[in-house]
Amino acid sequence: VIHYDARSPAADYARLEEAAAAEPRIRLVAKRVAGRWGSFGLVEAPLNAMKEIEAAGIEPGYVILLSGACLPCRPVAALERYLTENAGREFIEVADASWIGNGWRNERWKYRFWFDHKTQHTAEWLSYQAQRRLGLARAFPKGLTPRFGSQWWALTWDTCRAMLLDMARDPKRLEFFRTVWIPDEMVIQTWVHALVSPGEIANHGLTHFQFSNRGKPIVFQDDHVDYVASLDAFFVRKVSPLAEKLRAACLALAGGPDDGASFGPVGPRREDYPLKVMAQTWYPGPGQVFYRDQQVDMTDTVLAAAETPYVVALGPVPL
């Protein structure tokens, strides 16, 4: 089931419709929404996909949320075996506010966030300050407890269906989340906490991702082929659209046979790439170390923002 962002060019969507029409296993979500960063659309899109599954009468064992930047890093046959061996487990992070590394915690839901963080940051900040000073904090919806976690999950269809039913009983509770901060890290997690017993929640997903020290997602390139193949996960993100070698390797892995080996721990974060993580920042900064296989974003905007000269030191050459 594919949700295609409503902001995408109509011509691109028309080509997707044509391709999907020839493949009966593919369904397109009719009710498309815009999926901007931190917007409710990132929650609404997967919910609309669940409704599409329900309306079609499909009965999957699991629903796995992936983006266009995700690719498999293990055989699909191995994934099927893993889900069979762990039937009934919900693969999602469900944590209290301590899960949030820094920044707003309970403020995420106590106050209303109407403005786009990336394009209306000043208005967002002024609105938050005004609400805080005027004492306009609100209560969390009755019967729910705020929970947080990564937006990348794999849930049983029974839980997805129960979630849709519970949301439909009292639509005002879901409406509350339209104005929370980063709802995709809160909504599904909160409902899973309310509907599923703790023993059935794995507290990890099946998708590997990493962030830089500046909070930006690491984009995996062609030099990460061996690293990605070694991951204890079933999917990896974000994969660069230009990483043709890595994309081909991932697709080859997906179509390969299941070797039947016992599964080790799946889900624990790996931080064995710390130098790469620290080096790959959104923009270059003084004292930053770069690596020969790293692509640095040196746009005109970045260069114009440099108030003082930069000195770049090269070497030593590896022997």
Please name every model-derived segment:
Residues 1-319:
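ER/Golgi luminal nucleotide-sugar-dependent glycosyltransferases, focusing on the catalytic module
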